[in-house]
Amino acid sequence: MSELSELKCEACSADAPTVSEAEMHSLGADVPEWRIVERDGIMQLEREFTFRNFAQALAFTNQVGDLAEAQGHHPALITEWGKVTVTWWSHKIGGLHKNDFIMAARTDEVAQSNVRAD
C-alpha cells in the first residue's frame, strides 16, 4: 500500500487550485504507471488495465465504481473486452487535484487485488 493511497480525499470546491507542475511530477512519481494527458485543455490522469476476459474487466469497473462512490470522486471508465481505461480529473476545477492522485493510487490497489492478464 502506498502512502498516497492512505490519504483521504478532501472536499474540492470550484475555486480550489489545480496542482502545480512541480506537484504534478511529485505526485505522479507515486503512481508511475499512470500518464498525464491533456484533453480539451484539461489535464487528466489515465491508465489502462488489462484482464483475461470481459467478466474480470467488468468486475474491476464495478470495484472502481464502488471506490468512487465511497469517496464522492468519480472517474471516466471505459470498459472493453479484457481492458478498462480509468481517467481521473477533478471536474469542478477542470484539471488535476491531489484527490486524483490519491484515487489513482487506490485504483492501483484495487487492480492488484484482481487477477489480471499482465
UniProtKB/Swiss-Prot annotation:
Known catalytic reactions: (4aS,6R)-4a-hydroxy-L-erythro-5,6,7,8-tetrahydrobiopterin = (6R)-L-erythro-6,7-dihydrobiopterin + H2O
The organism's place on the tree of life at top rank: Bacteria
EC number: 4.2.1.96
Keyword Lyase included in the entry's annotation: yes
GO term, biological process aspect, one: tetrahydrobiopterin biosynthetic process
Keywords: Lyase
Pfam families: Pterin_4a
Enzyme class, first EC level, given as a word: lyase
Molecular function as annotated in GO: 4-alpha-hydroxytetrahydrobiopterin dehydratase activity
Family designation: Belongs to the pterin-4-alpha-carbinolamine dehydratase family.
UniProt protein name: Putative pterin-4-alpha-carbinolamine dehydratase
Source organism of the structure: Chromohalobacter salexigens (strain ATCC BAA-138 / DSM 3043 / CIP 106854 / NCIMB 13768 / 1H11)
